[in-house]
Amino acid sequence: MIAQLFKELDPTMTISLRTRLLTVLMFTTLLSGCGVNNIPQYDEQVKSAWAQVENQYQRRADLIPNLVETVKGYAKQEQDTLTRVIEARAKATSIQVDANTLDDPAKLQQFDQAQQQLSGALSRLMVTVERYPDLKSNQNFLALQSQLEGTENRIAVARRDFIASVEKYNTEIRTFPGKLWQMTMYRDQKVRENFKATAPNAEQAPSVKFQ
């Protein structure tokens, strides 16, 4: 193969120049085979996975105002529960973490805690709804509940994908030869923070269905 490349080079080149060019080509091929491109590739996977996490949490937040208004029409006396959902949503949407700040453990923890608090508030709201048969049979509420259930499932999938992509990326820059490439070519690439499993089944979607 090398001999064939050597023959196909411009014949006007000197042997020395052709040799240097082939050396560069061989070195580039060698680097590629040694995973020199893994870090940027895995970094893009982390960013893509995080974008899905953000999208699904935003979709959930967008469903909540209509859900609250629908419940309020049937259960005005549950104002305290509804207020807790509204406040939890406001807090969750106020904390923003973009793909470029995923190396900030405090920021990601704040984001995750706020989202988990919102999950808890929604679960308590669904328990409250059990006391209102007319609300449980309302078509608008049933549609919102179905959308919310689907979104919670997609959130769980997005979180699992993000966790897996971060673990893959972090392993790459902590082990050889990835650590060597990080130290020499990708010094701006840092270890990414990940979600912490704070409870059993933490990555499972919370139930928003009636028992």
Name each model-derived stretch.
Residues 2, 6-211:
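A helix-centric hydrophobic-segment signal that preferentially recognizes long
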